[in-house]
């Protein structure tokens, strides 16, 4: 997320970062409970990067209505891939994004392309609701072995982290999504999906109990 902040700083006079682990985006309580939290470390990193403002709100402030008012997008886009395996996730995501937009009132809003389906839904919501905010998608930041950076990576053991590097490698090299599924399963990954859409190869897998997602830009898919 620091790369999103850096991009925002380059393109704007003021940058606002927000940290909020949104319970409404988790369809499993266990996943919410175990989601990595490092507030003090995050604050120190944002201070070092000289972010102008950090917005920290609790659930009672974000949801004074106890989550009774929600944003539902009803097309196929919000029913497939991530939505199929994480019911309610995109409802919670769109709802909290809209709330923060009304609080901050930004000129631009920045999102990572690793969550590509999420990015498309956000763009669609902004257009449908006439939100005068520019949506900026930012390239995925990766470790030296190609694994997309994610807070969930911290939950991987050393052995699992080594194995996880095969995830993006296979997505990049496999001739088809079906071949990618077979190769990932042969290495012991539990595969939720691999799909070629929007010029990208989108995928979600488990390494042990840790769920990883990716959305690689594949040039031959864009032609």
Language-model regions, residue ranges each:
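Phosphate/ribose-recognition catalytic cores of enzymes acting on nucleotide-derived substrates
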Residues: 2, 183-223
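Nucleotidyltransferase catalytic core that binds NTPs
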Residues: 1-186, 197, 216
């Amino acid at each position: 997320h620091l790369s999103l902040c850096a991009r925002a700083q380059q393109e704007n006079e003021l940058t606002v970062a927000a940290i909020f682990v949104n319970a409404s985006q988790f369809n499993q309580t266990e996943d919410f409970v175990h989601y990595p939290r490092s507030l003090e470390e995050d604050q120190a990193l944002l201070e070092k990067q000289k972010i102008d403002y950090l917005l920290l709100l609790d659930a009672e402030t974000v949801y004074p209505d106890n989550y009774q008012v929600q944003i539902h997008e009803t097309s196929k886009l919000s029913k497939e891939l991530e939505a199929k395996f994480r019911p309610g996730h995109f409802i919670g995501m769109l709802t909290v994004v809209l709330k923060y937009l009304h609080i901050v009132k930004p000129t631009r809003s920045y999102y990572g392309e690793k969550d590509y389906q999420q990015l498309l839904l956000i763009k669609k919501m902004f257009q449908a609701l006439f939100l005068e905010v520019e949506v900026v998608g930012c390239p995925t930041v990766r470790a030296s072995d190609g694994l997309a950076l994610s807070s969930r990576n911290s939950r991987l053991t050393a052995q699992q982290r080594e194995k996880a590097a095969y995830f993006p490698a296979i997505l990049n090299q496999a001739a088809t999504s079906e071949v990618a599924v077979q190769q990932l399963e042969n290495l012991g990954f539990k595969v939720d999906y691999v799909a070629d859409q929007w010029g990208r190869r989108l995928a979600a897998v488990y390494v042990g109990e840790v769920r990883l997602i990716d959305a690689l830009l594949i040039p031959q898919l864009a032609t």
